[in-house]
Amino acid sequence: AYHRRPYIYPEDAYSLAVVKLGSGSNLLGYYMYHGGTNPEGIDELNETQRTPSTNYNDMPVKNYDFQAPLGEFGQSYPHYYTLRKLHLFMQDFGELLAPMEAQFPCPQDIKKGDDSFLRYAIREKDGSGFIFINNYERLQPLTTKKNVHLEACGVKLPRITVPAGTVCIFPVNVEGIRYATAQLIAKRDGKVYMEQIPGIPTTICMADGKVLRGVKARGTETPVYKNIYLLDSHAASHLFLDEAPAQPIIEDVAYTKVREATADYNITIGRNKVAEAPRDEHFADAAIYTIDIPDCNREGRLLRIDYRGDVARLYCNGHLIADNFYNGRPMLYGLWRLPEDCRQLELRVIPLQKDMPVYFPREADTTPGEEIVRIIVE
């Protein structure tokens, strides 16, 4: 929203999803899993403070990216890959997890920033279960938890140290594994894939009595024991993907500042008692840039505008095609959406002001004014 511009980290989405599963949920759902673009012709449905049905928030006119795992133009954000681990897990083990009851050994009246104990939950049924650990809280640094003793289904795990920021799921009496300080990811063609949790030594105790300690990740080609494969976090989040690691072709894009901003936007407080977003008429006073589109293959290419400002709008032949509330991240646009004959775009940027009644994340440069840092095609 205009007045509140959070910067979503991969751990934010992942920890929330793990906590939901550990608390008894069986269906992972997302408001936006793939970001979108608002369609033409229904301006009366734009989300603003003047529309109570949309919770009194001023949203961009076109952009509906929502920092979703897959962005507005299909780009993969880091949390797309971290969440894949849960999606694979639920696909292969969801039927086992679904009837398991949730148990909460730690206190449930948790206050924000409470760092006095490790947050975890257990789900179990008929002697099998999972331990869900969350030692992460958004914008609240939690400490490393030492000498942690976990027990589920009557099985005691070895004492471990849980590093700050750790979010993971340990199996108990699942797939021939009595317990493991590693996370189950998937089972395919008789092979069981697990993730080594950074900072936690991997112990795998098998139901046949075999105990493997200090196990190192070996990837998808070499098992650590029989049909058990241990992967590092990157390999686990990219498991079964056939993405070819392409080297991006980056081209700098020429741009020209046509006009300085002629007046500051007079920020008003809307009916919901928060800052109200600029309307169409306010962009008449914005700084104006022209952007020359390079002669290149546009398919799958993104225009990336690194800028500093309050709000930016992008136009093609006088027609609004994209907008952005600045939060420290670049503004993006899919070049394949442009008409073939489009060779130049217009960018209008309303400057930042001192002491704006707007929440900006720490990644944002809130120095008053506006500037284009760099524009590229990638």
Regions found by a protein language model. Name each.
Residues 155-158, 319-324:
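Surface-exposed loop/edge segments in extracytoplasmic proteins
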Residues 277-288, 323-328:
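Extracellular beta-rich ligand/substrate-recognition surface
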Residues 340-344:
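Extracellular Ig-like/FN3 beta-sandwich strand-entry sites
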